[in-house]
């Protein structure tokens, strides 16, 4: 443990996301989630980094980087807040990029740095940390041992579906009511609209497909319709183009004839399909086009041998109707001054 050294890069710019060690560390773990990729973090920072200070902590053993902690500092209400790069609202999973066996030491070194650094901070506000990864416990324990005040809360849940080997096995895994409803809805749309099909976006169709997705999203009722503000659409577009270039983008449509009636925006890598966002035509809600499209993507994922269908954050009921299990996400706040809460 003592042979490992923590380096802190406080004069970072976008070039820090091109560190070869980051790409190597990301590639080393076949189950690393998409939000740990340098591509995701770079696009997020370039779009939302104004008014923030970027710093990258790297833990090295000899010449080998074993962990990366991408952080930023922002002043809010006269307090200097540290957070994971990726923010709160747009990045579903956050935390250090490291092997699970190194979580304890990463927490050790991170908390040690918080206690000794000249870099000014008041609160380390760590959001969206998946409970199964287990970093939360290490961070809280080390912060408490070091005498820092802290607060721990579950802030949201994600939902994941571990895929079986066949569609029949998948249907059998659902409870009887959910299975009956899914079959009924799929039969109804086939009966009433036999020209219904699923279409995947390609590099050649991406420009037009993004416009279809944005228009459909903005046509939704309530908060969903208001979410796709211009700056959010720009971020989605930049992610789409960056991920399309490396084969990670999944932009899919349910079409009746030549008309799109539902769409999903997601990613695929490491045998996992991530469902990041979706939209459907509200005038056709009776036919559940969004649910039908997602069920088709589940079917396709099973057929192609993927391991996980990750619905990501959000409490939407349909995720659990389709057999997903809840994954709690924790928020830990570490206070430079104050007592434990």
Question: Residue locations for each model-derived region?
Answer:
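Short functional hotspots where side chains directly engage DNA or cofactors
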Residues: 321, 331-333
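Acyl-donor binding region in acyl/amide transferases
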Residues: 53-54, 74-154, 270-326
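Alpha-helical membrane-targeting segments
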Residues: 336-341
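A conserved beta-strand-loop-helix scaffold within acyl/acetyltransferase catalytic domains
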Residues: 6-62, 66-83, 129-158, 162-286
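Short, low-complexity, intrinsically disordered N-terminal peptides in bacterial proteins
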Residues: 1-5
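Conserved beta-strand edge residues that scaffold enzyme active sites
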Residues: 203, 315-316, 333
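Acidic/polar loop patches that form or flank catalytic/metal-binding clefts of enzymes
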Residues: 224-226, 251, 306-311, 328-331
